[in-house]
Curated annotation (Swiss-Prot):
Protein's name according to its UniProt entry: Tyrosine protein-kinase src-1
Species this chain originates from: Caenorhabditis elegans
Top-level taxon of the source organism: Eukaryota
Reactions accelerated catalytically: L-tyrosyl-[protein] + ATP = O-phospho-L-tyrosyl-[protein] + ADP + H(+)
Function of the molecule: Non-receptor tyrosine-protein kinase which plays a role in endoderm development by controlling spindle orientation in EMS blastomere, probably downstream of receptor mes-1. Also involved in embryonic body morphogenesis, especially in the formation of the pharynx and the intestine. May be dispensable for pharyngeal muscle organization in the adult. Probably phosphorylates netrin receptor unc-5, to regulate distal tip cell (DTC) migration during gonad development and in axon repulsion.
Knockout consequences: RNAi-mediated knockdown causes a growth arrest between gastrulation and the 2-fold stage and an increase in number of apoptotic cell corpses at the comma and 1.5-fold stages. The few hermaphrodite animals reaching adulthood have gonadal defects characterized by the formation of a straight gonad resulting from defects in distal tip cells migration during the first and second turns.
Lipidated positions per record (N-myristoyl glycine): 2
């Protein structure tokens, strides 16, 4: 099943309940002057919230929820604007304040708008509780180091652009990421500083010479003086709005939708199972629509496959929104990725990408596959044609794994045996899967190695000049494709060849692959800059 764009959380800032304002208008961007705000929340509340004792707004916006009703005076602030898409949803603008009425749903909270008095559901990852670090414009949540660097290096941002993120290696620590130069031609440089906790959660420090009761206090201080950092903090790095959790609150559970709500506007491509279209839901929301050829599978099997996709929620997996199964052809409705398949992108607009962008995309794909690996889901058709490309952040495209409608939940033996007569994309399929039909997470790792070959060659067909039967025979005899031109030797030796190990259990995990690529350029430089004396 083909699909076409995590929930990255973006902090937006607010004028509601702000007790201190830091003016950085002297660092004017070409577009506009910007003022960012620092909430001056109490120390005790901030620390207990960071310990996870509050209602869980950390990370990707999930968790918490508890028993339903909430104190009406608990106030939320909107991080982004949101337009209502259906009855029961509530529209709002960035900075609007709302009272939290019910938080029992992990993706949609029921609120009352402070100004209008209207009630309705809002996507949880579009709001934050006031006077917590999640409501701060500079807080990025749990994002990879390389993503943080791309955010502060976005075009037209000044020296001192910064964010604070939760460290992946130690969730009790934070990291301060700062743009050290504003050289637009050379892209600027970035410094990272560890923010550590004091004993007994009494505060935070970068250097023991100066401690702070809260992260807000730390930001205020270093916005006035660098005091050992590379420069003053000047401007919170802007971040992309997160992916909507669903088309609307109603479609979260009722994801069988009437097909007359869909308008198919432009055909994007054909596949073995049907066509892919660009369209709109209710004339508002851009979506991708996969139409299944009649007779491809039963409604029961179709819904079983779609249920797997519906439950998957990761920034590097395409989000499934809804289905239409009341009549044929069946539809799958997913988020729309503006730049299409990675294969076509590599052959066209992406043909000029440098090694840093290619490595970053490899890390994103491995991150999405790591999510499937953790849930014992096998993709079975991982290839550049089944990875989709969205917008760029600092020159690096956002990529997401798609077409995992073929995915199967592995049983205890960790093997899925394909039915007799099933067809496989031979050049991407591991030997044990091609010859015996045995698919595992490790056969996906083999396919990932072939996908890397596609990335490094900018979309060349694997095993050039060889037909399928020859590929099967030669691979069985030990043949492996040579190192592509321009591919770093370390990537070929430590990743591609290991992904193509004849013994499945000796192939790396996607967790290993993700961290290899995520840390690829970090290994040549100090991980964190020490503050100067």
């Amino acid at each position: 099943m083909g699909c076409l764009f995590s929930k990255e959380r973006r902090s937006g800032g607010s004028d509601m309940g702000v007790s201190e304002r830091i003016d950085v208008s002297r660092f004017q961007t070409p577009q506009q002057q910007t003022v960012f705000h620092v909430n001056n929340g109490g120390n005790e509340g901030t620390i207990s919230q960071l310990n996870g004792t509050s209602d869980g707004m950390m990370g990707n916006g999930r968790g918490g929820g508890g028993g339903g009703g909430a104190q009406e005076r608990e106030t939320l602030v909107a991080l982004y604007p949101y337009d209502s898409r259906a009855d029961g949803d509530l529209s709002f603008q960035k900075g609007d304040a709302m009272y939290l009425l019910d938080h029992s749903n992990c993706d949609w909270w029921y609120v009352r708008h402070q100004r209008t008095g209207q009630t309705g559901y809002v996507p949880r990852n579009f709001v934050a509780k006031q006077q917590t670090i999640e409501s701060e414009e500079w807080y990025a949540g749990k994002i990879p180091r390389n993503r943080a660097e791309r955010l502060v290096l976005s075009s037209h941002l000044p020296k001192g652009t910064f964010l604070i993120r939760e460290r992946e290696a130690d969730t009790r620590e934070f990291a301060l990421t700062i743009r050290d130069t504003d050289d637009q031609r050379n892209g600027g440089t970035v410094k990272h500083y560890k923010i550590k906790r004091l004993d007994h959660d009494q505060g935070y420090f970068i250097t023991t010479r100066r401690t702070f009761r809260s992260l807000q206090e730390l930001v205020r201080y270093y916005s006035d003086v660098p005091d050992g950092l590379c420069c003053q903090l000047t401007f919170p790095a802007p971040r992309l709005a997160p992916t909507r959790p669903d088309l609307s609150h109603d479609t979260q559970q009722n994801w069988e939708i009437p097909r007359n709500q869909l308008h198919l506007k432009r055909k994007l491509g054909d596949g073995n199972f049907g066509e892919v279209w660009y369209g709109k839901w209710r004339g508002i929301v851009e979506v991708a629509i996969k139409t299944m050829k009649p007779g491809t599978m039963s409604p029961e099997a179709f819904l079983q496959e779609a249920q797997i996709m519906k439950q998957c929620d990761h920034p590097n997996l395409v989000k499934l929104y809804a289905v239409c199964t009341r009549e044929e052809p069946f539809y799958i409705i997913t988020e729309y990725m503006i730049n299409g398949s990675l294969l076509q992108y590599l052959r066209t607009d992406g043909s000029t990408l440098g090694i840093q962008a290619l490595v970053d995309m490899a890390a994103q794909i491995a991150n999405g596959m790591m999510y499937l690996e953790e849930r014992k889901l096998v993709h079975r058709d991982l290839a550049a044609r089944n990875v989709l490309v969205g917008d760029k952040i600092s020159g690096v495209p956002v990529v997401k794994v798609a077409d995992f409608g073929l995915a199967r939940k592995l049983m205890e033996e960790d093997i899925y045996e394909a039915r007799t007569g099933a067809k496989f994309p031979i050049k991407w399929t591991a030997p044990e899967a091609a010859t015996c039909g045995n698919f595992t997470v490790k056969s996906d790792v083999w396919s990932y190695g072939i996908l890397l070959y596609e990335i490094m060659t900018k979309g060349q067909v694997p095993y050039p000049g060889m037909h399928n039967r020859e590929v099967v025979e030669q691979v069985e005899l030990g043949y492996r494709m040579p190192m592509p031109r321009g591919c770093p030797e370390q990537i070929y030796e430590e990743v591609l060849l290991k992904c193509w190990d004849k013994t499945p259990d000796r192939r790396p995990t996607f967790d290993t692959l993700y961290h290899f690529f995520d840390d690829y350029f970090v290994s040549t430089q100090p991980n964190y800059a020490p503050p100067s004396a």
